[in-house]
Amino acid sequence: MAKATTIKEALAKWEERTGQKAGEAKEVKLYAQIPPIEKMDASLSTLVNCEKLSLSTNCIEKIANLNGLKFLRILSLGRNNIKNLNGLEAVGETLEELWISYNLIEKLKGIHVMKKLKVLYMSNNLVKDWAEFSKLGELPLLEDMVFVGNPLEERHTAEGNWLEEAVKRLPKLKKLDGNPVIKQEEEEGDES
């Protein structure tokens, strides 16, 4: 099997293809590398102006080396082999959107550091219980979330109470699984 692509190699290819310098770019796309990227290595720290970073569709197992990305607002890590959220604390003060669907995440430990997070796309992971889901309540600005395809969502959708139970735990949500959240109190208040 071919050796993995390093971040440094991927950045060199990206610079060649786009004619931009990685250290100056606001948006860097390193998705679907062939062979895939396996490690978020220290070369990421060169992306000092990056606001949107895409590393989706690779074989990354751990979130790491984000400390140099002081302006990162959107991080796309969908379709990797990520098992937990450790490593996000480095961008906890700036990250507004985390796209991390199609991974192997069971536990949401560490999510509480994401104080600016508004959008969380984490469909098709392995979250099974409400105790983990409830940790999302520690995100003060979270308003748009996709959680479809997690065992917890599948079980409660089958029982017919997913939306109600999820919104009860995350009352600030405006959108869940692509659908606007309509709150009962608001509806009743509108009629008076």
Swiss-Prot record:
The keyword Repeat applies. One of its GO terms (biological process) is gastrulation with mouth forming second. SUPFAM superfamilies: L domain-like (SSF52058). Keywords: Cell projection, Cytoplasm, Cytoskeleton, Dynein, Leucine-rich repeat, Microtubule, Motor protein, Repeat. It comes from the Eukaryota. PROSITE patterns: LRR. LRR repeats lie at residues 49-70, 71-92, 94-115, 116-137. GO terms for cellular component: cell projection; cytoplasm; dynein complex; microtubule. Residues 150-192 form the LRRCT domain. It is found in: Cytoplasm, Cytoskeleton, Cilium axoneme. Belongs to the dynein light chain LC1-type family. Part of the multisubunit axonemal ATPase complexes that generate the force for cilia motility and govern beat frequency. Component of the outer arm dynein (ODA). May be involved in a mechanosensory feedback mechanism controlling ODA activity based on external conformational cues by tethering the outer arm dynein heavy chain (DNAH5) to the microtubule within the axoneme. Interacts with DNAH5, a outer arm dynein heavy chain. Interacts with tubulin located within the A-tubule of the outer doublets in a ATP-independent manner. Outer (ODAs) and inner (IDAs) dynein arms contain the molecular motors that generate the force to move cilia by ATP-dependent reactions. There are two mechanosensory systems that monitor and respond to the mechanical state (curvature) of the axoneme. One system involves the central pair microtubule complex and radial spokes and the second system involves the outer dynein arms. This is Dynein axonemal light chain 1. It comes from Xenopus tropicalis.
